[in-house]
Amino acid sequence: CNSACFTCDASYSTKIGSLTNKIYPVVDNSNAYWNLPLERVVHLDINGGEPSASKNYKRILQNLPPNLKSLRLNTNCSLVIEELEDIVAKGIDVTVTVSLDGIGDVHDYVRWPIKWDKFYSNLMIYKSMNVKLNTWTTVSALNIRDFKNIIKFVKQNKLEHSYAFLEKPDVLSVKYRNKFTSACAGQFDLVATQRNNNFELEAFLEEQDKVRGIDEALR
């Protein structure tokens, strides 16, 4: 993956792994896919890492199963997967799910180092494609205050939207009271309903900012 989202970890993101460990091992298990009876595959669901930044995923998209009817993939919208146009032209139903975890500066912090301007530009390219486009928000302490802006954005741009509440890392859960969630108590039933975790949250963010080389003033 080419992103080091604060809601992710090194087991999913090679970007985070490379920041935390210079000898971070990258395991290529793509043979497990190619050894499947691909002629029996009619639907393919591609999850992260980031498909647009993976050579393995690109190879899969260029050599899809012969009887494939539908394809869904998620993306952080840092890049455009241009192969999708050709896939649609083959009569395959394509759904693109874009991770939308904030607007503007909130996006840039939560989904570091992906920049909002690039994200938005690529999102509009996907919107112009002949694909089914939807957006997904993982609601955490870092973006709960921006959730209303996210809803406004998807409505203005006529985008399908779904969301779920983050469970891990637990320190970023909206269930705790802290400087981010307290102002949003009542927005959802579970927001800021449990103990104050400001101390743990600050320690977590300081460590994560340091790993990414982010000035804490941007938080």
Spans of model-derived segments:
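Helicase-associated low-complexity regulatory tails and linkers flanking the ATPase motor
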Residues: P25-N35, R59-I60
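Distinct, well-ordered alpha-helical segments
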Residues: N56-Q62, E82-V88, D146-K148
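Hydrophobic helix-cap positions at the C-terminus of alpha-helices
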Residues: L64, I87, Y126-M129
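Short secondary-structure boundary/capping segments
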Residues: L61, R111-K115, N149-I151
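N-terminal pre-core extensions flanking Radical SAM catalytic domains
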Residues: C1-P25, P37-L38, A192-R219
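Conserved C-terminal portion of the radical SAM core fold
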Residues: R72, I92-T97, D117-R219
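Core AdoMet radical
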Residues: D9-D28, E39-S54, P66-E82, K90-S121, ...
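A general structural signal for stabilizing positions within well-ordered secondary structure
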Residues: N35-L36, V88
